[in-house]
């Protein structure tokens, strides 16, 4: 069900200032004419001059043509925003599933005063009207014509090149929009005088359906949308006062995984200079699939919407041609049915290891990469797994305390860690059970939250940080531990996935929100850390050496900081015991038991063949016996 369309609100029309002729009596009264006339002309001239200066600030010429932006207010002063800038041709009709094409030049002036359409996607209807889910749902009309980006820049425009932050939204590669209120760039830009860019990219089947080897649906076109936006930044951000030689890419969840994939893809690597990965990593178990699984999901979707199955050859063209005839909402309605099994924190269409954008698996590329001199900021929130439990884990709901039974915990491990052997699942249960209180519902709830969070976010991020640091990168790490006073999710969920973003973007500074005074100060601190990192590659405050220092993360010391209302606290070992289990022990267990699993499969296959043979023999014997009895009559 698509969200209701919201009325687009454009800028107020400026009143034309009409120059009035002074009254004749003033012109003929020497004692009054000069002062009053000068005052009148000064007031009128000042108004016209101010409007002229504003027009100059809001008119920008980029390679494609001219843009008119809008002036936005913040408590600290105005910023200029250029919203809904087209950077690619609409990927509709015959362009569906294909790589993006740069936007052709236009004539006239593009109205860049309001956000444009959101890319077609699944809309969360699990808890209708609930702020915790609605804040992530599309807030503009859904369309395949959605490849637009936004630029916020200080007002007045910087006279010297200013560092640029480029945001990539999350949403499991199946949802997301740059126009969400939580991504409003005005507060960060005004407070830190950076330039901020965000872009839409295709999600779900439109961005990540893949028939490897096919030119018609090569896969990863959502990542290519992001890359094209980064190329646009290199070509055009100077017109907004931005510095194309100082671009920091930052994202959260699937956006963070995307940032990591651009780090691992040589054609993208030269388009930015620093990276921030919030609650996501390219090596997460949900972030990519292999070519075989990508093809299976694509053909399964085709089957579900009534398109003929594709093969490895020419049939792919017919399959894609059929998929292009299906309404966008029909594809969205069937996306979730292609997953191989019931699970949480798994998504239908995601980046594929295609040998092109990703020449190998993220793990292999991380292990083999040269990251000397790279500057990276990574982190997680305190309770990464809790958000996902209400989307399918047995016994969980936002509307109660989710005090689960032992049986629900065991079933939850199977959906939280899908596609592993029974032995591996049992190892997870053994590691996460509090054996002093193995039946305690609250402890079981927390344990399953940790299973999902550690497996999918915390330990992939820790692994990435350690590998990058060991290979010469300068890495900073954090755990975000503040639960917002405005959070609508229940207390048992703690600090859920995604709820640091509002502080990074300075949303507490919005006077229409009900954050505390301490949270406003906290948001200013976080914006300063992120902006410092964008400026220098170091989040620490260079102007205040007495301030608490945020040390680099190294493979040996593993130092990170806790981010909450208190001053920085330095800690060591990001979930070290749990991550040793996921990153060291479990892979060895799976490798060691691989042959056992294969032997079990072979034994079951032989047993099935033997059982089928015995059934067939019995049927033949019964048939013979009946014939023999009939011949005796």
Residue spans for each PLM region:
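Non-catalytic accessory segments of hydrolases
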Residues: 2-12, 18-223, 244, 345, ...
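Ordered, helix-dominated protein-protein interaction surfaces in large eukaryotic regulatory proteins
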Residues: 3, 22, 71, 89, ...
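C-terminal transmembrane bundle
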Residues: 498-500, 560-563
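Serine-hydrolase-like catalytic core of hydrolytic proteins
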Residues: 28-46, 130-316, 325, 359-391, ...
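Surface-exposed patches in mature extracellular/periplasmic domains of secreted proteins
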Residues: 307-320, 334-336, 440-441, 477, ...
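Substrate-gating cap/lid region and adjacent catalytic-acid/histidine neighborhood
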Residues: 283, 322-520, 529, 536, ...
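Alpha-helical packing segments of well-folded alpha/beta enzyme cores
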Residues: 145-148, 229, 460, 526, ...
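Short, solvent-exposed turn/loop segments enriched in Gly/Ser/Thr/Pro and often Arg
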Residues: 202-205, 250-256, 479-487, 545-554
């Amino acid at each position: 069900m698509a969200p209701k369309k919201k009325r687009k609100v454009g800028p107020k029309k400026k009143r034309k200032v009409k120059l009035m002729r002074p009254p004749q009596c003033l012109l003929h009264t020497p004692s009054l004419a000069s002062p009053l006339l000068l005052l009148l002309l000064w007031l009128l001239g000042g108004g016209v001059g101010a409007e002229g200066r504003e027009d100059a600030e809001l008119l920008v010429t980029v390679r494609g043509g001219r843009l008119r932006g809008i002036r936005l207010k913040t408590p600290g002063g105005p910023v200029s925003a250029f919203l809904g800038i087209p950077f690619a041709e609409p990927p509709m009709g015959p362009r569906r599933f294909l790589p993006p094409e740069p936007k052709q030049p236009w004539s006239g002036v593009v109205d860049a005063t309001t956000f444009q359409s959101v890319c077609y996607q699944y809309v969360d209807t699990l808890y209708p009207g609930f702020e915790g889910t609605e804040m992530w749902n599309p807030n503009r009309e859904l369309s395949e014509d959605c490849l637009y980006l936004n630029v916020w820049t200080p007002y007045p425009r910087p006279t010297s090149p200013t560092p640029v932050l480029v945001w990539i939204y999350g949403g499991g590669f199946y949802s997301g929009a740059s126009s969400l209120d939580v991504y409003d760039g005005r507060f960060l830009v005004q407070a830190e005088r950076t330039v901020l860019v965000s872009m839409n990219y295709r999600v779900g089947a439109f961005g990540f359906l893949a028939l490897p080897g096919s030119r018609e649906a090569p896969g990863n076109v959502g990542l290519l949308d992001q890359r094209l936006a980064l190329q646009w930044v290199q070509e055009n951000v100077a017109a907004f006062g931005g510095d194309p030689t100082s671009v920091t890419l930052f994202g959260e969840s699937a956006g963070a995984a995307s940032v990591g994939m651009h780090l691992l893809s040589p054609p993208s690597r030269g388009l930015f200079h620093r990276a921030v990965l919030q609650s996501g990593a390219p090596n997460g178990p949900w972030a990519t699939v292999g070519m075989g699984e990508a093809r299976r999901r694509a053909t399964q979707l085709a089957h579900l919407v009534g398109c003929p199955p594709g093969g490895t050859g020419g049939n792919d063209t017919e399959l894609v041609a059929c998929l292009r005839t299906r309404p966008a909402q029909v594809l969205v309605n069937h996306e979730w049915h292609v997953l191989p099994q019931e699970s949480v924190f798994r998504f239908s269409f995601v980046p594929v290891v295609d040998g092109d954008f990703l020449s190998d698996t993220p793990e292999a590329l991380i292990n083999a990469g040269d990251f000397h001199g790279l500057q990276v900021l990574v982190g997680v929130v305190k309770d990464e797994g809790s958000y996902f439990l209400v989307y399918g884990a047995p016994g969980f709901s936002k509307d109660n305390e989710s005090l689960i039974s032992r049986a629900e915990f065991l079933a939850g491990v199977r959906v939280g860690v899908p596609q592993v052997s029974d032995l591996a699942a049992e190892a997870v249960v053994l590691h996460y059970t509090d054996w002093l209180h193995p039946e305690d519902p609250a402890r079981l709830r927390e344990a399953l939250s940790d299973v999902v969070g550690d497996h999918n976010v915390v330990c992939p991020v820790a692994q990435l940080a350690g590998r990058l640091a060991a290979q010469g990168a300068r890495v900073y790490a954090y755990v975000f531990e503040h639960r917002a006073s405005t959070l609508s999710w229940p207390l048992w969920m703690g600090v859920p996935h995604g709820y640091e973003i509002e502080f990074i973007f300075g949303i507490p500074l919005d006077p229409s929100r009900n954050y505390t005074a301490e949270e406003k100060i906290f948001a200013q601190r976080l914006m300063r850390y992120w902006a410092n990192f964008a400026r220098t590659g170091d989040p620490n405050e260079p102007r205040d050496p007495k301030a608490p220092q945020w040390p680099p993360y190294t493979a040996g010391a593993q130092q990170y900081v806790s981010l909450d209302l208190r001053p920085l606290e330095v800690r060591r070992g990001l979930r070290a015991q749990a991550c040793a289990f996921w990153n060291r022990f479990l892979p060895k267990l799976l490798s060691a038991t691989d042959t056992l699993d294969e032997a079990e499969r072979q034994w079951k296959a032989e047993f099935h063949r033997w059982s089928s043979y015995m059934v067939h023999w019995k049927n033949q014997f019964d048939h013979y016996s009946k014939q023999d009895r009939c011949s005796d009559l």
